[in-house]
Amino acid sequence: MSVIAGVFGALPPYRYSQRELTDSFVSIPDFEGYEDIVRQLHASAKVNSRHLVLPLEKYPKLTDFGEANKIFIEKAVDLGVQALAGALDESGLRPEDLDVLITATVTGLAVPSLDARIAGRLGLRADVRRVPLFGLGCVAGAAGVARLHDYLRGAPDGVAALVSVELCSLTYPGYKPTLPGLVGSALFADGAAAVVAAGVKRAQDIGADGPDILDSRSHLYPDSLRTMGYDVGSAGFELVLSRDLAAVVEQYLGNDVTTFLASHGLSTTDVGAWVTHPGGPKIINAITETLDLSPQALELTWRSLGEIGNLSSASVLHVLRDTIAKPPPSGSPGLMIAMGPGFCSELVLLRWH
């Protein structure tokens, strides 16, 4: 067992309403002829506002992938440092207490990786174990928490952290309209989050009162590589998004969840908190229907989507933070759910104190 000691979400300073973002997209010359579908997709996304790492007027001038990636490195490190410092502060721990740092991103490239840059800025120990995760996309928030637990099960005195940074707005330089890209333009935004967790002995020493991490389950689905992802080229990241995505969720997720819960003597009716990635209205509805949940079960997921959009891997960690702030009764199980490129799911079983 391991224990979540602190969760902190960080958002860039530029916040825009969905209407402002829609108007900006339809004003791009290459979007001529797409105005109706852009407005329709943006209106149906259930997103009210989003945060961006740059002022809106800067994006039309950003046409080079290399230039965008330089900005990504600078801003991602800034947000990652802010998120990790906040999570450590919530945990009552110092940077030098960290034994393991996992970083997750899919919206930019950095060598040395983000973890090395964040470690230097915050003053982590020279012997900190660094684990950069790239390519997991939306599933990486839950997968990263699961990997924290994997380490801490064997290190009861240890402390480990996950930092997720996604700057989706920087994946569009030189962008030409595609249907998946238009869907993404309605949903994705920028942000970061960090989770600090401790092994069971260290958690007792510091009085960590976040939920316990009990177990996790991964499932990589067959013949699904093109369900979701990016094609990376000279113009940046081109979104791959199958129209069958919701159907894949409905096909697999119900059995994944019921089997995993049953292995712990639980069913969906026992779960007091659903910590679910806000992938978009169709995905949230598919999860609700396939698990036969009440309309209120994913309230915090819907709220996160509306307030900040889809932050890829960081989103489920924002929902985790919101759930900790509004916890279920003591002793209640919780289930973290995220899905992403592969195509795959990651489930993390939690228990509230």
From Swiss-Prot:
Give the CC-aspect GO terms.
Answer: plasma membrane; polyketide synthase complex
Give the keywords, sorted: Acyltransferase, Fatty acid metabolism, Lipid metabolism, Transferase
UniProt note: phenotype after gene disruption: Abolishes the production of phthiocerol dimycocerosate (DIM) on the cell envelope.
Quote the EC number: 2.3.1.-
InterPro entries attached to this UniProt entry = Chalcone/stilbene_synt_C (IPR012328), Chalcone/stilbene_synt_N (IPR001099), Polyketide_synthase_type-III (IPR011141), Thiolase-like (IPR016039)
4Fe-4S listed as a keyword: no
A biological process (GO) of this protein is: fatty acid biosynthetic process
Annotated active site residues, numbered on this chain, are 138
User: A Gene Ontology molecular-function term?
Assistant: acyltransferase activity, transferring groups other than amino-acyl groups
Concerning CDD domains, the annotation shows: CHS_like
**Pathway annotation:** Lipid metabolism; fatty acid biosynthesis
Recorded superkingdom: Bacteria
Quaternary structure?
Homodimer.
Q: What family is this?
A: Belongs to the thiolase-like superfamily. Chalcone/stilbene synthases family.
Protein name, UniProt field = Polyketide synthase-like Pks10
Organism whose genome encodes this protein: Mycobacterium tuberculosis (strain ATCC 25618 / H37Rv)
Q: Highest lineage ranks of the organism? A: Bacteria, Bacillati, Actinomycetota, Actinomycetes, Mycobacteriales
